[in-house]
A protein has these predicted regions:
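Extended, folded cores of ATP/NTP-driven motor/assembly subunits in large transport
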Residues: 1-323
Length: 323
């Protein structure tokens, strides 16, 4: 997407919009982007053995070049992307076939965009949670379903860290690691497509999560129409004031003109282009081995947010809920 032409980018955005519009108000979903430090054993290894010829010096130079490029590429950061969805149901028996249909539709929509995806089974989900609760990549995940009856432990025992500490208002601890949960306050009229990319390119352990709830279409249209009516009344009041003061009644406050235009465009998108209205909570959880490194990472993410007219706010006394 980043290197595509403008026409191709528009086509990709259109396809991605169709993916998002698939989710109606009964299907809340979230997009999770996890940057995790890999264990040393998982790092790339370059080994080109020497041979009995005159090119060993070239092989050695090539190996060093590859190692240098690997070191610069991601510094051991592994990047994962997840989409999680749910639906209301009376029980597992009712939910299972419906979830299966939604899963097939979502994977089909992603495939049309050229995105390969696969469903996670129970062990995969435990591995994801284990990685979140053991940042730094030092603790390997060891689990097998057959071990549960033998050990008497539950699944939570296999993924729980040594400790949680949420006593501080703006930070928390997971084992020996420091963490901070923040949310993104979106003040920009249009959110740049580069914001998320720049955050995820950082050399830091973090999790970006977008919790998304679709607003019912009829309710969304009714709400926007109500806002347009309110803006119309405000316009009338401003025009009355202008007439009484002897000013031109066509001169209105700039904010009022902007709000009126934005509301009309939003209503047109909902009614004519089959778009949907979403409620979004954008959270960022940073993790680091030291308090100072954590504050530096949060400051860097905050700088990226400010660059795109947004603000990163710390969740005061809500660190546990944010995590």
């Amino acid at each position: 997407y980043a290197v595509a032409s403008t026409e191709d980018q528009t086509a990709i955005i259109s396809g991605w919009s169709a993916c998002l519009n698939y989710f109606d108000s009964s299907l809340p979903f979230q997009l999770s982007f996890v940057n995790r430090r890999s264990r040393n054993a998982n790092r790339y290894k370059v080994n080109i053995p020497a041979q009995e010829d005159d090119f060993n010096s070239i092989r050695g130079e090539y190996v060093e070049m590859l190692k240098d490029q690997i070191a610069k590429s991601n510094n051991g950061i592994e990047r994962y992307k997840y989409i999680t969805f749910g639906l209301p149901a009376e029980g597992v028996a009712e939910a299972r076939p419906r979830l299966g249909r939604v899963e097939a539709d979502v994977m089909g929509n992603l495939k049309r965009l050229g995105v390969q995806s696969r469903p996670l089974d129970g062990r995969d989900r435990l591995a994801v949670l284990h990685g979140q609760m053991h940042p730094g990549g030092r603790e390997p995940f060891r689990f097998a379903w057959k071990d549960i009856p033998k050990t008497g432990m539950g699944t939570k025992d296999y993924i729980a860290p040594d400790s949680f500490d949420f006593r501080q208002s703006r930070t928390f601890r997971v084992g020996q690691m420091w963490g901070a949960a923040s949310y993104l306050q979106i003040m920009a009229s249009e959110l740049s497509d580069k914001l998320l990319a720049e955050i995820l390119e950082l050399d830091a352990e973090l999790t970006v999560t977008m919790h998304i709830q679709t607003v019912d279409q009829l309710k969304a249209i009714k709400t926007i129409k109500g806002k347009i009516s309110d803006i119309g009344r405000m316009k009338a009041e401003e025009q009355k004031k202008a007439v009484r003061a002897g000013y031109d009644m066509e001169i209105l406050p700039p904010d009022l003109i902007t709000f009126s235009k934005d509301a009309a465009e939003l209503l047109s998108d909902l009614q004519s282009r089959n778009e949907r209205l979403f409620l979004l909570t954008f959270t960022v959880v940073n993790l680091a081995p030291t308090r100072q490194r954590l504050e530096n990472d949060v400051f860097t993410v905050s700088g990226i947010a400010q660059k795109y007219n947004c603000a990163l706010r710390r969740l005061d006394w809500q660190q546990e809920q944010g995590f």
